[in-house]
Amino acid sequence: MSSQIKQVFARQILDSRGNPTIEVEVVLESGAFGRAAVPSGASTGIREALELRDGNKALFLGKSVYKAVENVNTKIAQAVKGLDALDQRLIDKTMIELDGSENKKNLGANAILGVSLATARAAASHLRKPFYRYLMDVKEYLMPVPMMNVINGGSHADNNVDMQEFMIVPAGFDTFSEALRCGTEVFHILKKVLIADGYSVAGVGDEGGYAPDLPSNEAAIEAILKAVKEAGYEPGKHVFIALDPASSEFYKDGKYELKSENKSLTSEEMIDYYAAWVEKYPIVSIEDGLAEEDWAGWKLLTEKLGNKVQLVGDDLFVTNPSILAKGIEKGIANSILIKLNQIGTLTETFEAMAMAGQAGYTCVVSHRSGETSDTIIADLAVATCSGQIKTGSLSRSDRIAKYNQLLRIEEELGENAIYPGIKAFVFNSDEEVEEVVQEIIVEDSEAEKVVVQVEE
């Protein structure tokens, strides 16, 4: 039966924050079916592809996505009907050209991404392959090391903590399932630690982590390490720390304003702030340590800490190959965060990941703070052997859904699932991990082979 697209349909649904988002369904001539829901961020980079919202305050406080839905059901559907779903590059290219803008503002990146992902899912169904294996069919896969956001602050929580995410990284284990068990235990012990220290844990942040009012940002790290020890694990051996300060959110007039500590720091002072933490704590990754427009500061940060920790560009690179290329050329950061909706198509996402791999940058596949029950990023992390994933804490079903999907994939792969542990990080790689990763890193001329595995 034919793999041509027969039907495309979109609807408005709600994300994990109760805000509207778009869900797309694609049906092929063969009857194969694919569905995808698009996430949304709270702290967004200024260069991200445009998420189209209606802006009518009378409807969902201006956040409805009816126009994006209409664009899918009319313009996009007409353009992609009859195209071969197995040709992902053609599908995405068609939508990009139909939109005609640099940031997908006309049709909406949310509309385009929904169709891109739903089409890929339908193609996988047509070939009767698991989605991760459809994206990349290799013998062995790296299971991603999870960065678990157990204390939320910044734009993700209603508290006085400046920095957005304090994460545990259970990298000292042999399997993903063992790492997940460790993370779960530490998360539950952390609640007891915070309560014992007099902090309220009545609510959680957008990504499922606790959101207590703390006397300082460093207090979050201290509480986490205490929980790690009380759970029976050793910091720096079993569990490490990762940070996402999301510093663009507290960068004002050239200074980093840490209100919880009554500090106003220059770029150099902010770098020294992190450097002191790196010496004191088992920190393996810092994401968006400086603001997205502070490229001079990023250069200094990379020179000072780039050989000690993973420095991840999220708002800095926004999963955009052209922006990443500039960062690579200037020696900025050593890792990129991968968020599908920052760039808006599966093809461009793979292009960014291939470019990063060729330059020796790591890739961290990531959720958004406004998530859905869709588990596509779990499959993406495994398919690309990225070795790392950010998908929130150990609560909220929208986060747990991704962890559960990874458990299923690891079980299915058996001995062909490799958990890289600390070796997944740029300053701790080894030959075994590199061997697996090289199977999915290709030259730009072969990027199409990465996007989909087409079987005649």
Curated annotation (Swiss-Prot):
InterPro entries named in the record: Enolase, Enolase-like_C_sf, Enolase-like_N, Enolase_C, Enolase_CS, Enolase_N
Record's GO cellular component terms: cell surface; extracellular region; phosphopyruvate hydratase complex
Catalytic activity: (2R)-2-phosphoglycerate = phosphoenolpyruvate + H2O
Cofactor: Mg(2+)
Gene3D superfamilies referenced in this protein's UniProt entry, alphabetically: Enolase-like C-terminal domain (3.20.20.120), Enolase-like, N-terminal domain (3.30.390.10)
EC number: 4.2.1.11
Keyword annotations of the record: Cytoplasm, Glycolysis, Lyase, Magnesium, Metal-binding, Secreted
The protein's enzyme class: lyase
Compartmental location: Cytoplasm; Secreted; Cell surface
The UniProt record lists the keyword Manganese: no
Binding locations of (2R)-2-phosphoglycerate: Q164, K339, R368, S369, K390
Domain of life: Bacteria
Keyword Phosphoprotein: no
Gene Ontology MF: a single term: magnesium ion binding
Pathway recorded for this protein: Carbohydrate degradation; glycolysis; pyruvate from D-glyceraldehyde 3-phosphate: step 4/5
Residues involved in Mg(2+) binding: D244, E287, D314
Biological-process GO terms, alphabetical: glycolytic process
Active site: E207 (proton donor), K339 (proton acceptor)
UniProt cofactor note: Binds a second Mg(2+) ion via substrate during catalysis.
NCBIfam families reported for this sequence: eno
Family from the record: Belongs to the enolase family.
Assembly behavior: Component of the RNA degradosome, a multiprotein complex involved in RNA processing and mRNA degradation.
Function: Catalyzes the reversible conversion of 2-phosphoglycerate (2-PG) into phosphoenolpyruvate (PEP). It is essential for the degradation of carbohydrates via glycolysis.
Name of this chain's protein: Enolase
